[in-house]
């Protein structure tokens, strides 16, 4: 038996190391079952965490990932197969549209409605300055 000296000079004759146990590993199905149980009623998250011996923060992390639809999905990081195709010549035939379709259709009031990719709409008159309209549309595209 080894004897250790303490900070104050006292001798320590016994030293006990307490093991906290091994880390629990839950399968995806177990996690989903625990999360479903935690959603069963008001105040069930804390009780469920205590029942399974996990922290509330871990259970809340699982609950958040389930709400966001991230839980139980496979990771998609990594490489994807790539194919190198031989370069081939494909002739292109130019087709002219019928004469009836060549003229743009004008609305009776001369107004246009432009919808940006983010859903914002701009209604302009037919005499709008194109450069100014482009600046406005670029500005609207940056707004999210």
Swiss-Prot record:
Span of the signal peptide: none
Entry keyword Cytoplasm: no
Gene Ontology BP annotations: DNA transposition
UniProt KW Protein biosynthesis keyword: no
Gene3D superfamilies listed in its UniProt record: Winged helix-like DNA-binding domain superfamily/Winged helix DNA-binding domain
Keyword field: Plasmid
GO molecular function, one term: sequence-specific DNA binding
Superkingdom of origin: Bacteria
One Pfam match: HTH_Tnp_1
PANTHER family (alphabetical): TRANSPOSASE INSC FOR INSERTION ELEMENT IS2A-RELATED (PTHR37936:SF3)
Family: Belongs to the transposase 8 family.
NCBIfam families given in the database record: IS66_ISRel24_TnpA
UniProt-recorded name of the protein: Uncharacterized protein y4hN
Species the sequence originates in: Sinorhizobium fredii (strain NBRC 101917 / NGR234)
């Amino acid at each position: 038996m080894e004897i250790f000296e303490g900070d104050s000079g006292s001798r320590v004759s016994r030293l006990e190391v307490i093991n906290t146990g091994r880390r629990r590993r839950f399968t995806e199905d177990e996690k989903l079952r625990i999360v479903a149980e935690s959603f069963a009623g008001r105040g069930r998250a804390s009780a469920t965490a205590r029942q399974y011996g996990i922290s509330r923060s871990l259970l809340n992390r699982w609950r958040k990932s389930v709400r966001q639809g991230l839980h139980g999905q496979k990771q998609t990081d990594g490489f994807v197969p790539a194919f190198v195709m031989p370069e081939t010549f494909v002739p292109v035939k130019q087709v002219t549209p019928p004469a009836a379709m060549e003229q743009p259709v004008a609305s009776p009031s001369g107004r246009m409605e432009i919808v940006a990719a983010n859903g914002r709409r701009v209604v302009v008159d037919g005499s709008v300055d194109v450069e100014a309209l482009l600046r406005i549309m670029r500005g609207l595209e940056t707004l999210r």
